[in-house]
Amino acid sequence: MSRYRGPRLKKIRRLGALPGLTRKTPKSGSNLKKKFHSGKKEQYRIRLQEKQKLRFHYGLTERQLLRYVHIAGKAKRSTGQVLLQLLEMRLDNILFRLGMAATIPGARQLVNHRHILVNGRIVNIPSFRCKPRDIITTKDNQRSQSLVQNSIASSDPGKLPKHLTIDTLEYKGLVNKILDRKWVGLKINELLVVEY
């Protein structure tokens, strides 16, 4: 299954707030969940919705998500927590968290178009796994810096997680450590994703 490129508001209406997918929010009067789906939720449906939330928020394919679950399952710590740490340490997600991109798909595009450097080297793979003490910068050319400058200006500096720091004048971000569970910007029960 390929990456989702369809209407984003449909997914938000169905699954709830997904800040990584888009900044838009549905109208408060149009609550389609209650209209179509009343009654008892089955366990399978609950687990499927949690998995879909994770997939659409981080912009993953089904195969990528299964690979991350497999890697997290081999770890000795809690599988759900390791899964979220793996997903949060992706380069496209870190750019989104730093405020260098408005959404995760926007961050993917920045990385794919070779505007981003990690430790002084161009990285064009959005799923690149960042480590603590990685320095993320933009290229020195004007076009790359203007793209990031617009996003930084419109982002909220109070929402920056504790495991990241940003220098807005030099367009430079730093990964301090691996994040804690409480700083994940998505309301999700990761254990249901692992069970699915």
UniProtKB/Swiss-Prot annotation:
Entries under SMART domains matching the protein: Ribosomal_S4, S4
UniProt xrefs under InterPro entries: Ribosomal_uS4 (IPR022801), Ribosomal_uS4_bac-type (IPR005709), Ribosomal_uS4_CS (IPR018079), Ribosomal_uS4_N (IPR001912), S4_RNA-bd (IPR002942), S4_RNA-bd_sf (IPR036986)
Domain of life, source organism: Eukaryota
Function summary: One of the primary rRNA binding proteins, it binds directly to 16S rRNA where it nucleates assembly of the body of the 30S subunit. With S5 and S12 plays an important role in translational accuracy.
HAMAP family named in the record: Ribosomal_uS4_B (MF_01306_B)
Family of this protein: Belongs to the universal ribosomal protein uS4 family.
Protein name: Small ribosomal subunit protein uS4c
Source organism (scientific name): Brachypodium pinnatum
Biological classification of the source: Eukaryota, Viridiplantae, Streptophyta, Embryophyta, Tracheophyta
